[in-house]
Amino acid sequence: MTFLAWRYVLACALFTLVALLWRHPWPRQAISYLHLSITGVSLHCLGLGGVFLGIDRQIEAGVSALIMGLQPVLAAVAAALFMHERLAGRQIVGLALGFAGVALVVGDRLDDGAGTLSGVAWNLLGMVAVTTGTLYQKARNQGINPFTGATVQFAAAGIACVLLSFAFSEGESTWTPHVLGALAWTILVLSIAATLLLYWLISQGAVAEVSSLFYLVPVAAALIAWPLFGEHLSLHALTGMVITMVGVALVIRPAGKTPR
């Protein structure tokens, strides 16, 4: 949590600088700051916090990403219930295939002792938090400038992570070249580039379509964890990855034109 606290505090500082230099408009209503703060804490602090705490409790990075890959199903169901978004038949099939593919890989990895129940529980909490933040962003934060909006969200997430860091760690950090490199990557690529891209996608498409892209996170994470951490890929895992990618393709594929 200390790492996340530093990440969000520094990301907030960068976004503030950009917002001031380019004179981006700030929200005028106080309620907008509350909505942005709720999204920031849910999506950034609790979402990634659940992932980090799960990994800290001996769950493998690949398995952690695979569990988070179940988020599209939860998001699609929640969007249908609370935001009345409709799903085409092929999208329902795609979500089911994606779920099956992720479940296949997660089950295979857990059978190999790659995770613990507490680690899975924290990851599930993170998945629910990411879903909540995504829906809240779609419902409450549309029309707000992405730079100033992200500044408020990272400020709220940073404060929350600072408080939680004292509950789950000593609040101390050991700075090494690897840690500094990871921090720079998470700030520039994940907190800035990826966050702006996510918010743009949410503003352009349905929650189910955007969330289905999260199915690709487990595939990429498992492939990256193979050479970096020595986490093996079994036939079951590879099969699950293929099924997952087919499912995502069905969800995001544009609907065909109705023949005349």
Regions found by a protein language model. Name each.
Residues 29-31, 65-68, 84-104, 113-120, ...:
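Loop-to-transmembrane alpha-helix entry segments
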Residues 2-13, 43, 52-86, 126, ...:
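Specific alpha-helical transmembrane segments that line the substrate/conduction pathway
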Residues 36-40, 65, 95, 119-127, ...:
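Residue-level signature of transmembrane alpha-helical cores of multipass secondary-active transporters
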Residues 12-15, 75-77, 81, 95, ...:
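Transmembrane alpha-helical segments that form core, pore/gating elements
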Residues 39-48, 71-72, 106, 127-134, ...:
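Transmembrane alpha-helical core positions of polytopic small-molecule transporters
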Residues 6, 63-70, 135-158, 191-227:
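Helix-helix packing/entry segments at the starts of transmembrane helices
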Residues 15, 78, 87-109, 127-130, ...:
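Hydrophobic transmembrane alpha-helices of multi-pass small-molecule transport proteins
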Residues 16-68, 104, 187-205:
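Specific transmembrane alpha-helical segments of multi-pass solute transporters/efflux pumps
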